Amino acid sequence: MSDPRYSIGIDLGTTHCALSYVDSSTSDGEKIVQQVLPIAQLTAPGALESRDLLPSFLYLPHESELTQGDLTLPWTASRAFAVGEMARTRGAGTPIRLVSSAKSWLCHPGVDRRAAILPSDAPPEVARVSPLESSIRYLTHLREAWDHAHPDAPFADQDVTVTIPASFDPAARELTAEAARAAGYSRMTLLEEPQAALYSWIQKSEGGWRKQVQVGDLILCVDVGGGTTDLSLIAVVERDGNLELHRVAVGEHILLGGDNMDLALAHVVARKLAQQGTQADPWQLRALTYACRSAKETLLSDPTTDAVPLVVPSRGSKLIGGSIRTELTRAELTQTILEGFFPQVDAAARPVSRARVGLTQLGLPYAQDAGITRHLAAFLGRQVAALDTLEGVQRTLPQGATFLHPTAV
């Protein structure tokens, strides 16, 4: 087998997937050119577009819902489901047929991750799939999109790296590897996401990273993703006269991220609707959550927009007249995210345990305290002595320090 021409990196995210790659024939040492694959996907029935991100959503349509050709892709005409942008937008109106957060379910030890349990609240007539199968379908789509764009360089012949949270337990890691193998990833390596972020920083420095750090520096890597928050500490040490990066600690698996923010925003909007005399049922609340996700992304990407209209369809016969209409404002978004998820706290603050209400979606053991800064304070407090036995670094904490002090974030 010849040496692979490309090194492919895949971010299998909770809410989005991405594929980047490097052509080894045009690389020279630490100077490389990284590219992102525009991923061909359906954005509406029969409408094909290539976008940098593949939304991590799977839509399972009713057998009579779409017409022939609506799900056709350049590489197949026999698909009975949709992944990506079409799945996300169509599923927002019919959430009982939408699979989301498959990555969170894949690391949930309290369920059979090979069992057909998603969508978790689908009625009996909706065929379900497993968290493992959902992941296989996302990874398969990425492989097929690559092969469509690079017919002269088959995916199976390239070196592939798939990122995972550092806090994934052995079972979740093995399930991710199993999904990749089932999707046709024959030359695959798993890489922890904080390490990937650090490698990206090193690569972008074009060899200059050694001038930006010194022995004793402690780098805090915070990865707030769609479904999880990953915390890692990496120390700069000296060994045999060379600077090295050594991982000191990895945080607990915290099921807390963008999904929780979307749920929180949906509850904020639902309370506003209730004050106006409109009560959203559970089905509408789920649809409202997806609408808030889209509105959140719009507000965060466009600083000139102050509010985004929200429309949640009714399940009754009067689909238009029965729709719920409201909006998400920038003020509501900012207050909910900053106060709820990133409050300013003392270093002694710790996550609060409480009954699982409000921000808990059926079946997923979300973190009971949404304050990411409190989880961070607890993590740094637990690691106060982490450098005491680390060779190659000479660093002392202030007298009476109660938490480990990072020098870079």
Spans of model-derived segments:
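Extended, hydrophobic alpha-helical segments in both membrane/secreted and soluble proteins
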Residues: 172, 176, 180, 194, ...
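Acidic low-complexity intrinsically disordered segments
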Residues: 186, 243, 313-386
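Short beta-alpha connecting loops at secondary-structure transitions
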Residues: 39-40, 245-256, 273-280, 360
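Gly/Thr-rich phosphate-binding beta-strand-loop-beta motif of the actin/hexokinase/Hsp70
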Residues: 2-29, 102, 206-247, 292
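Short glycine-rich phosphate-binding loop at a beta-alpha junction
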Residues: 152-165, 280, 284, 309, ...
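Conserved phosphate-binding/catalytic loops in two-lobed NTP-binding clefts
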Residues: 183-196, 365
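Conserved phosphate-binding catalytic cores of ATP/NTP-utilizing and phosphoryl-transfer enzymes
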Residues: 1-5, 190-222, 381-384, 391-397
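Phosphate-binding loop and its immediate beta->loop->alpha context
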Residues: 32-182, 192, 263-297, 301-308, ...
